[in-house]
């Protein structure tokens, strides 16, 4: 299973459609990455999601522990990148829906 559309929307709003690592505006060229892989017990939740550009997503996934070259992104580091970027976006006047109740109260104009 993958992230729900609601979680994808929340992460895109929270990051301003900018990558949480390189901070580049990416528009549609974004992916939501599992901080802890599902294969390792990670979940499809907002807390386990980090929005990344295609390049940073490839970089995060590329590390090979059998041939360690460079320093692997850790879960803790990814969480800090995400949280710091969400705070930076929020300080510019954007307000993310941080709880499910807040998110569900948002009205969609049609």
Could you say what each language-model-derived stretch is?
Residues 66, 73, 78, 85-88, ...:
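Accessory nucleic-acid engagement/destabilization modules that flank
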Residues 3-12, 18-51, 60-74:
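Histidine-centered nuclease catalytic patch
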Residues 83-110:
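Charge-rich interaction segments
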